[in-house]
Amino acid sequence: MQLNSTEISDLIKQRIEQFNVVSEARNEGTIVAVSDGIIRIHGLADVMQGEMIELPGNRFAIALNLERDSVGAVVMGPYANLAEGDKVKTTGRILEVPVGRGLLGRVVNTLGEPIDGKGPLEHDGFSPVEVIAPGVIERKSVDQPVQTGYKAVDSMIPIGRGQRELIIGDRQIGKTALAIDAIINQKDTGIKCVYVAVGQKASTIANVVRKLDEHGALANTIVVVATASEAAALQYLAPYSGCSMGEYFRDRGEDSLIVYDDLSKQAVAYRQISLLLKRPPGREAYPGDVFYLHSRLLERASRVNAEYVEKFTKGEVKGQTGSLTALPIIETQAGDVSAFVPTNVISITDGQIFLETDLFNSGLRPAVNPGISVSRVGGAAQTKIIKKLSGGIRSALAQYRELAAFSQFASDLDDATRAQLEHGERVTELMKQKQYAPMSVANQAVSIFSAEKGYLKSVELNKIGDFEASLLSFMNSEHADLMKTINDTGDYNADIEGELKAGLDKFVETQTW
């Protein structure tokens, strides 16, 4: 059979049209070294900083070092089964974690996988762990309070929505307790909470989760866990994962609170990764970009304006601002706040709550040192009644500490100095508060009012706690309407002052403690 040229060309065209090839563009490389959770890869020509690299066995690594002829990557999890010669490939995406309301009440790992045995997660999508913080124009000034429930904090070191307030102190001094109580106090405020546990024992985290559940706060909280036994990469990334989960609420016009417990351990994990990647060490062997490690994380905590929220939600949410408030925790060694990481985080944040070992050991809990604790922006957000009443608390405590040190050497004190010392002693005693017992605004206002207006003068020092408990019980039963008004509005005027005074006068005349 002979074919003419036309038939041949038609046949070729037909075959070309019918030709079907499935092509997959992949950038493959080969592992040339594996050690201590770090892999070195040759042959990856097109890879991004922070990109996920797919490993054999459906595992992933993150590219951190991009060198001329190799890529240094850190493995997300166990690496014992990896070997030289294994093939890897790029994915073209950076690490993302699930976000949404379905995560509330759940315990997840750094990758957003559930580890609480409650079944699969319900989520609203995925968000990258590394996100650029909102710009200056997209932000709104801080003017709404976050009540921690602690008299010492809410009166002297107030925290606003969108603020970054550092909790700093030595180990076993009540840093986590303060943060957990702040979370418990948000269960009825509408503020969604994220608790990020980095480098802690699994038993410690289990206890925290149990306490949150007991006090009804777990349903309002996402717990992100990277235990001490997990890979350094997971400990380093856990705060960023938790931040993305908190930003979900901020960007939709809601308020959220995130606790990083603690950033010292995150910095140690990052130092470990950097040294294994052969990056040049700096002060205290930390890499040069350890400041950027924390600044890019903490800058994401912000209060954003209504225009930002409307633009993000494509017009679904209008006229609402959103906020992400951060409470980072830093552990110091023997009270040394001038070490590298503490000074970095102090300079990044909007204030710090300094917890002191000597105060803790003397029985003052929370062990807040009011002299060097400060809130740089929270004053504008403080509840009106607490702001008006607490003006003299900080100065009374500061004067008391100075005079107490002086009075140890002075045998005879004048009446004014003795009165200041006695007032300071009573205020110090009043600032004590039990764990898992956050106080409402009205209860705080009544306690501070009793100190400021001199009702504690006739109370023995060891009876201050009993006096306060009886007073609050009396006010909540006999003056319930007044307490509700204070809690609802936070206002302070002549009428409220008169009612408070009448209530305390009646209590002192008729009640015992």
UniProtKB/Swiss-Prot annotation:
CC annotations in GO: plasma membrane; proton-transporting ATP synthase complex
Residues annotated as site: Required for activity: S373
Binding site for ATP: G169, D170, R171, Q172, I173, G174, K175, T176
Source taxon at top rank: Bacteria
This protein's record includes keyword Translocase: yes
Chemical reaction(s) catalysed: ATP + H2O + 4 H(+)(in) = ADP + phosphate + 5 H(+)(out)
CDD domains to which the protein is assigned, alphabetical: ATP-synt_F1_alpha_C (cd18113), ATP-synt_F1_alpha_N (cd18116), F1-ATPase_alpha_CD (cd01132)
Entry's localization field: Cell inner membrane
Principal location listed in the UniProt entry: membrane
Listed GO MF terms: ADP binding; ATP binding; proton-transporting ATP synthase activity, rotational mechanism
Keyword match Nucleus: no
The enzyme's E.C. designation: 7.1.2.2
InterPro entries on file: ATP_synth_asu-like_sf, ATP_synth_asu_C, ATP_synth_asu_C_sf, ATP_synth_F1_a_nt-bd_dom, ATP_synth_F1_asu, ATPase_a/bsu_AS, ATPase_F1/V1/A1_a/bsu_N, ATPase_F1/V1/A1_a/bsu_N_sf
Root EC class: translocase
One Pfam family, short name: ATP-synt_ab_C
Assigned keywords, A-Z: ATP synthesis, ATP-binding, Cell inner membrane, Cell membrane, CF(1), Hydrogen ion transport, Ion transport, Membrane, Nucleotide-binding, Translocase, Transport
Membrane topology recorded in Swiss-Prot or TrEMBL: Peripheral membrane protein
Protein family per UniProt: Belongs to the ATPase alpha/beta chains family.
Physiological role: Produces ATP from ADP in the presence of a proton gradient across the membrane. The alpha chain is a regulatory subunit.
Record PANTHER family: ATP SYNTHASE SUBUNIT ALPHA, MITOCHONDRIAL
Quaternary structure and interacting proteins, as annotated: F-type ATPases have 2 components, CF(1) - the catalytic core - and CF(0) - the membrane proton channel. CF(1) has five subunits: alpha(3), beta(3), gamma(1), delta(1), epsilon(1). CF(0) has three main subunits: a(1), b(2) and c(9-12). The alpha and beta chains form an alternating ring which encloses part of the gamma chain. CF(1) is attached to CF(0) by a central stalk formed by the gamma and epsilon chains, while a peripheral stalk is formed by the delta and b chains.
Identification of the protein by name: ATP synthase subunit alpha
Lineage, top ranks: Bacteria, Pseudomonadati, Pseudomonadota, Gammaproteobacteria, Alteromonadales
